[in-house]
Amino acid sequence: MTYKRVGSKRLAFCLSYFMLTAVSADVVTEDDLLADMHLVSSVTHMNQTLDKTPAAVTIIDRRTIQASAAVDVLDLFRLVPGFRAYYVNANFPGVTYHALGDDNPRRLEVKIDGRSVYESIFSSVEWTTLGIELDDIDYIEVVRGGNAPADGSNAFLASINIVTRSPLQEAGWKIHSQIGNDNIRNNAISYSGQLGAVQHRTVLRHSSNDGFEDFAGNYAGQFTQIALDDGADTTTFGFRGLWTPSAKDSIELQFGFNDSEVGIGDINYILRQIDYQYQHLNWSRINSDGSTFEFTSYHNKFDLSDQKDALTFYQALNFFPEGPLKESLAQLPDKLIIEPSHKAISERWDSEFRATFDHRHNVRAAYGAALRRDKVKSNMLFDMSDSSAENSSRVFAHFEWQMSDKLIANTGFLSESKDGGLPVGSYRMAVNYQLANNHTLRLGFNHGYRAPTLLESNQSTFVRYDENLILDGVVVSDSDIHAEKLISSELGYTGSLFNDQLHLDMRLFSEKMSDVIAERREQYPDFDGQLNIRDNTDSVTARGLEWQAQYRPSSQFLIHANYSFVDLTHSAFYRSTPVEQIRDLSGVNPKHLGSLLVNYVTNRELSLSAMLSHQSKIRHFSGNDDEGFTRLDVKAAKSWQLAGKDAEVALTIQNLGSDYRENYFYNQFSTRYVLSLKIGLL
């Protein structure tokens, strides 16, 4: 189903803004800007080459993005070893690393230009609200492994920083349109130019699709039909401005909004309306001695409304078993107990100061401090009409010591404090040894913590008749809930061969997670006799191997391959009363993940791509196993010059073969055809 709702006032503002800012600007070539493309900063907040970082890093650069057969951002993470990208619903995706991939994966930090998009209300990332497409991305830094010493609790398993294209990299107008089956309709218009001394890039985008096709087929031995109302309709506006008042200083301002309507649910679907907005300010200075200062501050606001079927008290009584309790409750007057609309608001304010110094006695360092305030409001999730807020702070420091020409040591720590709680500290140590030119071994140790989120530590979800009568207890947080713990070690290798044409990355890892937050069941005096308690219930151990390789013998040819093997042991404390029950969930993560991308660009600017992705079987405790899949995506794209501007037409075919299952049996990913057109205008 496709939902149609466009904010006319916002749309009018955006169109007016485009017309007012249409001025010419000089073009700076991409080669001028990407000289330091292989420098990464997400691991230590210092620019480092890949052979000096204390953790494994994957860079998805512009060339790889263009070569891929990806249609949206989610597809790109199939190119990263150990990363699993999946769909809970057609427009409700999830991404996780190695383990713990549920409907709301919440142990992965995701940033856009350094601004966290991790939302407090569901303790996860709402990918629908990101408001970016492949054309907006310059490159992506992915830290594979716990990155809490750099990014805090959200980066418990890994972290992602999506870096968008600078306003200096384009000039003038550009339109992009996509059409495809499942009623895919995506249209965008962007403008890069100058407002006084400010270089800017501004984008207006509208996207819609009908989601997965309705399910009709055999399930559990019988013919089943399910209507999937999981379409989406989204309008996005984004502005990025860059001002350089001096040779030392640069100031960047970003703001935008996203209006979405998305169908979500487990067989029974509801309509979720999302209004999302953000503001992001960054100031940086490069001093003459090579040291730097940086200050960044941002605000995210996530406002949602779930439209669902209302429920009256007498309707709820139909779910109660016959007996004296039901007869007694039937004497009470009828009333509405579940509203047809559930509203929730999540806000985050975050400010961080960061500084670096270089090469003092062969030591470089980065250090900083930050303040954060999270505020949420949801009567359904917190059983109160007032807002719930949490203040937190963090301090960090990272050091790189060049011990010799061949040996580098890295160490770093971060301490987080929240209202009324003890501080938790995460640290990492690593040594990198250069075996030979372009061949480096890395030995690393990581000790990280993930503090409970605002939802995890304060959830209280009940269905009430009134203040004194609870009909159903759903979820409540345990009063003694505390931080999750990760202890990991790794042996890594980075290297290059054939004059830097072939780049290799391998990682052997052991990751032990304890006090993992999930839900246990206990007896409760309500209609079903059960209450879910959010508590430290699970323990997870992951051991395995992952590698990636990219071969670029020329500017026309690219091969990218990756593979991961994860041996997972997952124990869950499922029920505490009346009898304790432990469940083995070791099969809920695929043991094998991998992908292969091959791209060739002819002399006539015809780009041909094939992308193969594989995921092995997932074994669910219920026995409803996901058999895994091997999926082939192909793309052909033709580029040319039109009146001195770039133009491109492309056809992408995803899953060239039989349908496969995405997460639930009724989510069948069929062959998808997407035709796109990009045109640069004067």
Model-found features: residue ranges?
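N-terminal periplasmic accessory domains that precede
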Residues: 73-76, 93-98, 108-113, 127-130, ...
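Flexible loop and strand-edge segments within Gram-negative outer membrane beta-barrel domains
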Residues: 209-213, 230-234, 248-332, 336-347, ...
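Extracytoplasmic beta-strand/coil segments of soluble accessory domains associated
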Residues: 37, 42, 49, 57, ...
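Membrane-embedded beta-barrel scaffold of Gram-negative outer-membrane proteins
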Residues: 294-308, 374, 434, 442, ...
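Gram-negative outer-membrane beta-barrel transporters
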Residues: 366, 402-408, 421, 509-512, ...
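Periplasmic-side early beta-strands and strand-to-turn transitions of outer-membrane beta-barrels
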Residues: 148, 161, 168-171, 176-178, ...
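Short acidic/polar hinge/loop motifs at secondary-structure boundaries
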Residues: 116-144
